[in-house]
Amino acid sequence: MTKKKEHVIINNPDKLKALYEANRKDIWVGFNNRHYDQYIMKGILLGMNPKKINDWLIVDNKEGWQYSRAFNKLPMINYDVMPSNDETMKTVGLKTMEVFLGSNINETDVYFRIKRKLTQEEIEQTVKYCRHDVEQTIKVFLEKVSEFNAVHGIIQAFPKE
C-alpha cells in the first residue's frame, strides 16, 4: 500500500472519475472486486445505472463481463483478496474472514433494498459500514501480502510492450 488516503464518494460520478483517472494504472485491491465492485464502478463511470448492474450480479446471479462490452473500455487491474477453494470454487465471505482474524463483525441497519433515497443518518451509517469493510479488507490483504508479492513478481518478470 503506497497511498493511504481515504476517499468517501457519495453520488458524485465526476469525483469517482477523477479518482479512477488518477489511479487507473495502479492495482485495485478489494474483496470480491473481481466479480462485483469493478463492474459497479465501471458502470458508474460509463453513466450506467449501478442498481441495474447490482441486480444483474446479485439477483440474477450473472457475471459482470456479460452485462456490457463497454466495461472493456475502462482498464482496471484488480487483485481480489477473497479466498476460494480451488476444487469447489466456493468462496469465503468477508464476515467469515473477520471471524478468522479475530475482528468484530459490523453490520448495518440500513436495508439494502430500500425503495427511497437514504436519510443523512442512513448515509452516515452506510459510510461507517463501508469503512469497516475496507479496514477488514486491508487486514485480509496484509495477511496475504506474500501471495500478492509472488503474483506481482511473476507479472513483473515478463517484458512490457
Feature roles, as predicted:
Residues T2-T96:
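Conserved DEDDh/DEDDy metal-dependent 3′-5′ exonuclease domain
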